[in-house]
Swiss-Prot record:
This is Peptidyl-tRNA hydrolase. The lineage of its organism: Bacteria, Bacillati, Bacillota, Bacilli, Bacillales. GO terms for cellular component: cytoplasm. Hydrolyzes ribosome-free peptidyl-tRNAs (with 1 or more amino acids incorporated), which drop off the ribosome during protein synthesis, or as a result of ribosome stalling. Catalyzes the release of premature peptidyl moieties from peptidyl-tRNA molecules trapped in stalled 50S ribosomal subunits, and thus maintains levels of free tRNAs and 50S ribosomes. One of its GO terms (biological process) is rescue of stalled ribosome. Its main location: cytoplasm. GO terms for molecular function: peptidyl-tRNA hydrolase activity; tRNA binding.
């Protein structure tokens, strides 16, 4: 079983913020396939569905971002999901808007949601899709910046990025060859 995790903060006020881009990608996949996160357990909203012939566990942690691992690790354990079948989608300040970077493994890179997942799983050896949101340029603090909603102009770019990232996830589910998916989907979304 594959496990697709989108990171974000719960609540209406966080919708369409930079920090919630992981939720947006998972929501895009779910909406296009008419799935819903209809279950809750271990601090996570989730569903198990069949997609491209593969059983898939979709998770959105119902903790705040910094505690995401408290939802992800117990659900993966409960459903006996191997860490090699996990993909986490999240915002990345070190990538410009429009950039998507798929990685087989790696550090948290300063992202507190990823730090929590790595700590709870006891490893950083899992796949991730880093979605560029850029850095603040006008002296705004990083916390204020990532919790700020995208502008209308930014949303034009980010809608393409969301769709691109969702297709990358679906491609991995279908093929299980993450190296091929990386070659196809890494880079700038136009």
């Amino acid at each position: 079983m594959k496990c697709i995790v989108g990171l974000g903060n719960i609540g209406k006020r966080f919708e369409l913020t930079r920090h919630n881009i992981g939720f947006e990608v998972v929501d895009d996949i779910l909406e296009r396939h008419q799935f819903t996160l209809d279950k809750q357990k271990f601090k996570g909203a989730y569903t198990i569905e069949r997609l491209n012939g593969e059983k898939v566990l979709f998770i959105e942690p119902m903790t705040m971002m910094n505690l995401s691992g408290q939802a992800v690790a117990p659900l993966m354990d409960y459903y006996n999901v191997d860490v090699e079948d996990l993909i986490v989608l999240y915002d990345d300040l070190d990538l410009e808007q429009g950039q998507v970077r798929l990685r087989q493994k790696g550090s948290a890179g300063g992202h507190n949601g990823m730090k929590s997942i790595i700590k709870m799983l006891g490893t950083d050896q899992f796949k991730r899709i880093r979605i560029g949101v850029g850095r603040p340029t006008n002296g705004m603090s990083v916390p204020d910046y990532v919790l700020q909603k995208f502008s209308k102009e930014e949303m034009i770019i980010m809608e393409k990025v969301i769709e691109h990232s969702a297709r990358a996830v679906e491609s991995f589910i279908e093929s299980s060859r993450f190296d091929h998916v990386m070659n196809e989907f890494n880079g700038e979304v136009k």
